[in-house]
């Protein structure tokens, strides 16, 4: 589709109001443009639209993204984030930021040191940088 096709007079122009207000349209592409049937709908509720001539009822399942509200044991933040990560205890309990930091410490220093460090800084507001106290420590398995 090129710009000439989009600007062709047979195509309906879309206004800002039509984008902001929900409109139900049925267009049969096999019919010529003059025979195209357009039904505009008026919103009744968040999940139901009825056409203006009451000939058809269309159900729309509008579902908001629901997340589970959790509390990160490391930084004590409460989030409804869909992304939770594995922590030192092996469970998916850390928020995304703490989980990424734990994984970084885990890959560099091993499970034992990462778990020990996370237990030391638990509940303390700390920048998520590799601590100087762990520099020079070799990785343990």
From Swiss-Prot:
InterPro entries: GATA_TF, Znf_GATA, Znf_NHR/GATA. It comes from the Eukaryota. A zinc finger (GATA-type) spans 72-98. Keywords: DNA-binding, Metal-binding, Zinc, Zinc-finger. Coiled coil: none annotated. Pfam families: GATA (PF00320). SUPFAM superfamilies: Glucocorticoid receptor-like (DNA-binding domain). Transmembrane segments: none annotated. The keyword Metal-binding applies. The keyword DNA-binding applies. One of its GO terms (biological process) is regulation of transcription by RNA polymerase II. One of its GO terms (molecular function) is zinc ion binding. Gene3D superfamilies: Erythroid Transcription Factor GATA-1, subunit A. This is Protein GAT3. It comes from Saccharomyces cerevisiae (strain ATCC 204508 / S288c). The gene is GAT3.
């Amino acid at each position: 589709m090129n710009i000439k096709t989009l600007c062709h007079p047979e195509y309906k122009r879309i206004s800002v109001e039509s984008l902001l207000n929900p409109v139900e349209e049925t267009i049969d592409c096999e019919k010529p443009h003059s025979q195209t049937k357009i039904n505009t709908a008026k919103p009744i509720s968040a999940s139901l639209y009825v056409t203006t001539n009451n000939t058809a009822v269309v159900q729309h399942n509008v579902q908001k993204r629901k997340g589970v509200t959790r509390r990160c044991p490391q930084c004590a933040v409460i989030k409804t984030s869909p992304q939770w990560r594995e922590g030192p205890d092996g469970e998916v309990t850390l928020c995304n930021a703490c989980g990424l930091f734990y994984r970084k410490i885990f890959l560099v220093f091993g499970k034992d040191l990462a778990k020990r460090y996370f237990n030391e800084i638990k509940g303390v507001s700390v920048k998520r940088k590799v601590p100087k106290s762990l520099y020079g420590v070799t990785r343990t398995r």
